Amino acid sequence: MGKVIGIDLGTTNSCVAVMEGGEPVVIPNSEGSRTTPSVVAFTKNNERLVGQVAKRQAITNPERTIISIKRDMGTDKRVKIDDKSYTPQEISAMILQKIKADAEAYLGEKVTQAVITVPAYFSDSQRQATKDAGRIAGLEVLRIINEPTAAALAYGLDKESDQKILVFDLGGGTFDVSILEIGDGVFEVLATSGNNRLGGDDFDQRIIDYLIDLFKKEHGIDLSTDKMAMQRLKEAAEKAKIELSGVTTTNINLPFITADANGPKHLDVTLTRAKFEELTADLVEKTMEPTRRALEDSGLTPDKIDKILLVGGSTRIPAVQEAVRKFFGKEPFKGINPDECVAIGAAIQAGVLTGEVKDLLLLDVTPLSLGIETLGGVFTKLIERNTTIPTKKSQIFSTAADGQTAVTVRVFQGERAMAADNKLLGEFTLDGIPPAPKGVPQIEVTFDIDANGIVHVSAKDLGTGKEQHITITASTNLSEAEIEKAINEAKKYEEEDRKRKESAETRNNADSMVFQAEKTLKDLGDKLSSEDKAKIEAEIEKVREALKGTDTQAIKKATEDLQQAFYSVSAKIYQQGQAAGANPGAQTTGGEQGNVYDAEYKVVDDDK
């Protein structure tokens, strides 16, 4: 079995780790960074960029740059670029392809399997979408695990004593809180809660809205209609937020942000930490409600929590740390890297699956209740939230009308009393039920949640033994045909990326060869015959001409021809030098040492 990597597929940044020698190691990307921006872009000539290079060009190419795609996972949203539309799964797969390629370069071997993390509060459709993204990227996703649980694995791998820990995970786009009991290699999740629409992006947006408002009041211009200005504001807001974690005042200076009839306009604003905290106070408070709910579900009080782990870049915000400190009456633990611990935990889980990590048992839970719609639109729960997974539960239902021969099973996920207020995961029909008075037929509905948190449902007529099975595939998930098409598209992009890389390397080699040849011509000077010099210069010119085009093979051929000509001349000079050194006539001519060398050079010239 090859290496199985652990991936934290984040809203803002992603990270990958692997087990090496029994220890989890973060894999740096091709740019040398330990995290990769979760950004995808398409240039005007449709070249695909992923990661740091995509983020760098976002200001000049905002309409073709895709950020925070994780927030759209499990939805039917599409990203339209020119005449092609991409699903969130396909965009996520592009990020995963980059991560996969970087891991392969680091490990020196093909990588085909991974453990990928998701927010604990992700629904079934969001989890399935993540699995599909992995498949499109050429990865078999062995396990989907919850981000807070992964962070707990990273923290507790070497801990001996029993502890109750709370993981407070505030990332770029999502918020989770999980409470676990750990000890003797067992990691048991007691409760989890969260908010899939709360994260660092929302804190950035408050600064952006504030700057737009100030600028409008001062200049009467609405920057929100200018996409390039908005991208500059987004980057400046993120930078200001990060800076305010370390200082109490920062300056946001964006010259030439826009222009009107009177000329260019500049934005120059001083933002204090106090003002930032005022703008985002309600966002910080929003993290407290899921925290209270998780504590309530676990049956614990704040004083019973031994450690609070801060996970996700947004937990560096001082107001967030202060809110946690105030709520629990103790300092949160800061001994783990909030950007890397989730990927490290995923790598540990990968190690468990491959047998590299022994004596570790992970017991996770389902974040939301699961059930079906029953008479009157009521949501009847079969599996309560925070039930340990994998799990299986059955319940007997019956028909609602006399002579009813079919029942439609509509599967929902959520906590509301009425089915319509929860998320519909999918539906299927069990037909062929023998006609009978209402309430007589016995229909057994079984819910089965696997270790990935993905739901399988079956309905069985106990009278006839007829059964229907489905793995939930909501309308937002991709069909098998769509996945296959996306896999082929991804392979095509991979091939294009390979060709682009080959082209760049070929051009670099050609440039390098031309430089080397020209330098050697200059260094050799008169030692080179005019015939050989002309030959090399002609080959250099052929390479230059080839470089003007885009034919990689032509550039390769011209470079190889120059290389051969260069080697041929070099060998000739070397042989002539040896022959001249061995000529005894040079020793018996007499005269001074200088004359001997003159004679040698003349001999070389004569031979040519």
Curated annotation (Swiss-Prot):
Classification via Pfam families: HSP70
Low complexity: compositionally biased ranges: 577-590
Region (Disordered): 493-514, 577-608
Positions of modified residues (Phosphothreonine): T174
Basic and acidic residues composition-biased segments: 493-505, 599-608
Keywords: ATP-binding, Chaperone, Nucleotide-binding, Phosphoprotein, Stress response
Reported induction: By stress conditions e.g. heat shock.
Alphabetized InterPro entries for the sequence: ATPase_NBD, Chaperone_DnaK, Heat_shock_70_CS, HSP70_C_sf, HSP70_peptide-bd_sf, Hsp_70_fam
Keyword ATP-binding: yes
Regions that span the bilayer: none
Domain of life according to the entry: Bacteria
Gene3D superfamilies: 1.20.1270.10, 3.30.30.30, 3.30.420.40, Actin, Chain A, domain 4 (3.90.640.10), Substrate Binding Domain Of DNAk, Chain A, domain 1 (2.60.34.10)
GO MF terms, alphabetically ordered: ATP binding; ATP-dependent protein folding chaperone; unfolded protein binding
NCBIfam families: PRK00290.1, prok_dnaK
Assigned protein family: Belongs to the heat shock protein 70 family.
The protein's name: Chaperone protein DnaK
Organism whose genome encodes this protein: Acetivibrio thermocellus (strain ATCC 27405 / DSM 1237 / JCM 9322 / NBRC 103400 / NCIMB 10682 / NRRL B-4536 / VPI 7372) (Clostridium thermocellum)
